[in-house]
Amino acid sequence: MTGEEAGARQADSASKLYPEADVPSPSLGSAKDVKRWVRWVIPHRLSGREPVAMAARAQLRHGVGKEVGAIPSIWMYTLGAVGTAWNCKGEKAVHTALTLWARHQGSNAAPMHMVEAKGTPRSFGAAVRALAEKGRGDKRPEETPVFRRLSSVVAAPAFDALAHHLRGIVDLLEAAEMPMDYGLLAADLFEWQSPQ
């Protein structure tokens, strides 16, 4: 069985598990689209203690750092619907955001995808700032591991390098059990690919 056949087969079985009426349009052609898809797919298909959700998270963790589309078993999450024409920027943004979320969620009991914290959007920047403040102690901000890793993210010359450096910060966020909005991260990753 080819990768495409496996992905199509999984998408068919998923459509029986999840009613398509409540699924947002899987178009990934804009930052708004990728944000909406990630914000929908995490709570509706990937969260919880059900075996299907736990297996999906494990498969997504396996996809961290891998090429978009390299793992057919995660297509239904990272691509939305198999066989649809996709925007490459959208695919990369969703794949990266969801695989990093699965790594961040890890064995944490509390949800690591949070749209808001006390009424304020929980962006990547807000989560990193909270993490830096939490672990700062007597150090100056630029002396903290978070600052060094954030500097690597900011200086990333290519998308693959950006994703690699984001992984380091996600590991710190996981250890500190600090959630963030992965929909916003997906939108940021989409926009990063088209600098103005």
Features from the language model and the residues they span:
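Conserved aromatic-histidine-acidic binding/catalytic patches
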Residues: P26, G48, G63, W86-G90, ...
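N-terminal interaction modules that seed assembly of large macromolecular complexes
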Residues: W40-W101
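Amphipathic alpha-helical interaction surfaces
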Residues: K66, A70, L100-P111, A127-A130, ...
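Short coil/turn segments at secondary-structure boundaries
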Residues: P72-M76, A110-V115, H165, Y182-L185
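Compact, glycine/acidic-enriched structural inserts
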Residues: G119-R148
